[in-house]
Amino acid sequence: ENGFYGAQDLFDEVIIMSNTIHNDSTARFLKKAFTVTDGYSDGMITDIYNKQKSFGEKKNAPFIAIVADDILGKNLKRNSELSFFATRFRHANCGLLAIFTQNFKSVDTILRNNSSDIIIFKQTNKRQLEQIEEEYGGVYEGKFLELYKIATAGKYNFLYLRMKTGEAFRNFEEKIGEYGNILVGERISDTEAGLPTDTGA
């Protein structure tokens, strides 16, 4: 059965780079469906880019997606090839460059500035939530925290931001805000939202 939100139909190849994928028993399905590498190095990105460019015109290259999971702060340095690739990946016929991290500030400024879509799950560290608000709150004109609370209330829910349009969603389906406007009537208290109080070390 073709799962994973139809990724096999959307892309000719999906490349997943993860330091921990072999420690996750549920990842066996990903390993069957996609190209999976254990870890990250700048050379991997260079090889992918060169391979894509070897097809000549962009339209002749395979349409690919790259997912980098849990690689930040380990093998990834500032000004890495991944950061550089973020500014030119569409020229290599890469339709998706997704980066998952548990440490927001470990993401290079270049990557953050070139992000068109942001997914934020419920945070357990107050300082990290503040950093995310500092980064993206201006787009939502002081309503970021309220949108976060509405979106992440409930198990497994997340806040999805479309930076180019200023739209905010609960998960992918329900639009809850746009720039400084909240489009739903519900309001969530800090206690109900489980806002973090731990600032970390």
Question: How would you describe each model-predicted region?
Answer:
Residues 15, 33, 44, 53, ...:
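Generic alpha-helical secondary structure signal
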Residues 153-201:
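Conserved P-loop NTPase motor module
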Residues 129-168:
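P-loop/Walker A phosphate-binding loop and immediately adjacent motor/lid segment at beta-alpha junctions
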Residues 1-13, 19-27, 33-144:
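Conserved P-loop NTPase motor cores
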